[in-house]
Amino acid sequence: MQVLVRDNNVDQALKALKKKMQREGIFREMKLRGHYEKPSEKKAREKAEAVRRARKLARKKLQREGLLPMKPKPAFGADRGRPGAAGAGAGAGAGPRGPR
């Protein structure tokens, strides 16, 4: 992978490289290859991902057809870039779905 450095601006080039790597899915693949995944676990994960994609596609289709209400967009600047920032218990080690 290659990125041009313009005017010795390394920060901008690094940002562009990270963006390219994110688009290519390199970070995700590194995370998956960080440890061994049994074939049965891989199969289960891929099946779950396929189900998730199908549900998302169906939900989007229903929203386009007007059968489901559109998800309200947050006000500009509200909780941008902070997953799980809104909601109760988000600061006490709870994930986006709450404590487990």
From Swiss-Prot:
Compositional bias annotation for Basic and acidic residues: 37-52
Basic residues biased stretches: 53-62
Gene Ontology BP terms: translation
Gene Ontology MF terms in the entry: structural constituent of ribosome
Annotated Pfam families: Ribosomal_S21 (PF01165)
Any one GO CC term of the record: ribosome
UniProtKB keywords: Ribonucleoprotein, Ribosomal protein
Cited InterPro entries: Ribosomal_bS21, Ribosomal_bS21_CS, Ribosomal_bS21_sf
Coiled coil feature spans: none
Keyword Nucleus among record annotations: no
Statement: the UniProt record of this protein carries the keyword Iron: no
Biased composition (Gly residues): 84-100
Region of interest: Disordered: 37-100
Family according to the record: Belongs to the bacterial ribosomal protein bS21 family.
Entry protein name: Small ribosomal subunit protein bS21
Gene label: rpsU
